[in-house]
Structure formats: C-alpha cells, structure tokens
From Swiss-Prot:
Its EC number is 1.3.5.2. This is Dihydroorotate dehydrogenase (quinone). One of its GO terms (biological process) is 'de novo' UMP biosynthetic process. It comes from Haemophilus influenzae (strain ATCC 51907 / DSM 11121 / KW20 / Rd). It is a peripheral membrane protein. Pathway: Pyrimidine metabolism; UMP biosynthesis via de novo pathway; orotate from (S)-dihydroorotate (quinone route): step 1/1. FMN binds at residues 64-68, 88, 141, 174, 219, 247, 270, 299, 320-321.
Amino acid sequence: MYQLFRHGIFQMDAEKAHNFTIQCLKLAGNPLFQPILKSLIHAPKGFPKTVMGVNFPNPIGLAAGADKNGDAIDGFGALGFGFLELGTVTPVAQDGNAKPRQFRLIEAEGIINRNGFNNNGIDYLIENVKNARYKGVIGINIGKNKFTSLEQGKDDYIFCLNKAYNYAGYITVNISSPNTPDLRQLQYGDYFDDLLRSIKDRQAILANQYNKYVPIAVKIAPDLTESELVQIADTLVRHKMDGVIATNTTISRDTVTGMKNAEQQGGLSGKPLQHKSTEIIKRLHQELKGQIPIIGSGGIDGLQNAQEKIEAGAELLQVYSGLIYHGPKLVKELVKNIK
C-alpha cells in the first residue's frame, strides 16, 4: 500500500510531497481516524528502555525535521514510534531559505535539503504539544534564528529552552545544521563552551522551578575531523550533557558523485549517510566511555544497519529519510526487533 502512496508523492516536488504527507498524518491522527490507522499498522509494543533518565516505550524515534511544527504528532505516534523529536524550532517564525530547497537522490535513497530552519516558531509548536494525545516521549529540537548573530546565538537557545522545558521529555540543542550560515561554528571552542555552560545553568534553574529534570542532548555533525570529535566529546563530558545525537546531515558528496541532484547545496541524509554516521557513533562511544548516551541517526533503512548503530554504541535510534523511502513497515520492523 505504501508503494502506491510513494509512487504518487514522488511525482511531486520533494517539499510539496513532504507537506502533503504531514497533512495526511495530521488527518490520520484525528481521534476519528486514528483507530483506522492503528488497525492498518498493527504497531508492535517494542522493548521499553530508560535513557537519559527518561522511560522510552521503545528505542525507535522520529528524527527532527520530519514534523518541524508538531502538526502531526498523533499521526506519527500511531506508526509505533517510542519517541518523536519535533523541530527544529526557533524563537520566532521564519521562512527558511529560497525554494526549491529539498531534492531526492532516488537511486541512492538520499535526500538533500537546505531548508534553513523554516518553522512557525516555538509558541506554535508548544500549543501543538499541549494538544497532542500521543503517549510516547516528545523531544523538542531547538535552534537559533537566521538573523541572530553567533555572539547572541545562546540567547535564542535559552529563550527556546525556557519555553520548551515544561512540555518536553527531552530537549535537543541543534548546532549542526549546515543550512544556517556559520551555525556549525557553535560546535567549536569558546562558542561551544559558553553555549553549553549557559544551557546547563539555565537547566538547573528550570529544574528547580518546575521540580523536574528534563535532559538536554546536543546534535552534532558527521563532518568532523578526529581532533574536532575528541574536543566535542571532551566538552560534552565536562559540561555533563545528558545525551548526544549523532548525526545531522552531511555536506560531503563522496557517496553520491555524479548522481542527479548531487550538486545541490545543503545537507545530505538517507542511505549515503549511513556509514559515516555509524563511524562517528563508534568513535564517539570510544571517547565518551559510556558517560553520555548516544542517540544514533543517519541512513537507517533496515534492521541490519540499525543493529550496526546499536553495536557501535547508540542506545536509541532515529529515522526520517528511511521512512520516506520505505514507509511505516520500516518503523514496525525496527520496533519489533531492536532492544
């Protein structure tokens, strides 16, 4: 059935297809229709897992970028995910980069996007989270507005942290999108140190205010040198971050040279990212020595490479591009088998 749906949406521009899918899932998540979707999916229960102090119904999640504004929480939830990471969301709404900005690399099962954090703003997202009936864990992925300078960047993250804290199972700090100018600079040196220090200080204040501890993860890029990775791992440990998501999209085109759309600017996700993200997980795991849990993301399209990420050191997994190419059966297969 999904193959038929995929054939239809693949006739559309990639972003239009994405928006159409979100609307379908929003409708499917409606209390009137959700039982129908659930009966079609027959989502297995999966294996509960406690990571970052949070109880996840199962270790399979939706990666950020799929439901940026939380418009289809209950629809995605009905597919069987143990957790959904919403966003990336910024303090105020922004349009993102010029269209077209999403491109399929069908033969490689990849996607290139240069969206640029297009979203309706944190307040819109929080309203959707408040109204959702989904029983799994909701993660909220936060970023900075394009017009905010690097020097002021931490203010945007603190603003979003304040808004999201009481409504999130965990929060992700996204400093690794390649589509906001200079954003990845926040992964390095004094910027990184200062950002994490500010975030941890604010987390302590909010934990006291709300009388609950909401863990904070950092999402990193796959395009890191060995020394950069070591430095990032050291900084994460030093600031006692609660989790790390490895990885975001890649700016490398090594795996797709010569393919249609490979020349497009932006971050590459899907199968071409598979090996690279797993290698980063493996190295990160060696550096972190079990002190900080890793959430693995990047190119998961089946049980084998999902298992590879677990063996490399990931405790939870996230999918997005694989869902586009393989449909809900991918989620079902992973939930049923990954512990």
